[in-house]
């Protein structure tokens, strides 16, 4: 059997709803995927992780697509954000990371067992759709205490 590694890059709203995603081979640099991920967007702000830090990427996104790329800077960074901004970014990133955690742990996105590329794409899309449907059901049920409760929907 042959296994292929992949990376899942996604855009989400600040409360965790997945709006778009791109899948790349595991050996591709994260910063290259940003261009594909943001292809149809203009004038948005993206909060990325440290894998997207690059001196050229942030100004290029800003000048070409009017996209602000924000990320938590390293502790020893000279031009770190003010404390209030860092706290806000941390809070938003925590919610976004929860969405990714739910995709991997509850919907097993990291274990897509398929025999073809079409099967891989289909299964991945279904898992993202299941996450978003769970998210919307939680919103409709007023379970919006900052966490989408996928297990609670399924198991009661």
Predicted regions and their residues:
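Helix-centered, glycine/charged polyanion-binding patches within enzymatic domains
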Residues: 45, 50-118
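Polybasic low-complexity intrinsically disordered regions
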Residues: 1-63, 70, 74
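Generic signature of intrinsically disordered, low-complexity segments enriched in small/polar residues
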Residues: 6-12, 24, 55, 74, ...
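Detector for Asparagine
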Residues: 27, 32, 54, 76, ...
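Basic, amphipathic alpha-helical segments enriched in Lys/Arg and hydrophobic/aromatic residues
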Residues: 88-156
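A general marker of short, structured functional hotspots
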Residues: 2-4, 17, 37, 48, ...
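Generic hydrophobic alpha-helical membrane-segment signal
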Residues: 8, 37-39, 85, 107, ...
């Amino acid at each position: 059997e042959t296994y292929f590694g992949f990376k899942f890059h996604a855009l989400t709203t600040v409360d965790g709803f997945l709006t778009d995603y791109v899948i790349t081979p595991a050996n591709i640099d994260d910063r290259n995927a940003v261009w594909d991920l943001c292809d149809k967007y203009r004038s948005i702000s993206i909060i990325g992780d440290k894998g997207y830090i690059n001196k050229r990427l942030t100004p290029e996104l800003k000048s070409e697509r009017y996209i602000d790329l924000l990320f938590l800077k390293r502790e020893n960074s000279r031009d770190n954000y003010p404390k209030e901004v860092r706290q806000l970014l941390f809070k938003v990133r925590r919610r976004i990371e929860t969405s990714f955690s739910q995709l991997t742990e509850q919907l097993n996105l990291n274990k897509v067992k398929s025999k073809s590329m079409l099967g891989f794409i289909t299964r991945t899309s279904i898992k993202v759709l299941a996450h978003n449907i769970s998210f919307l059901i939680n919103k409709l049920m007023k379970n919006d205490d900052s966490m989408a409760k996928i297990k609670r929907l399924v198991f009661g």
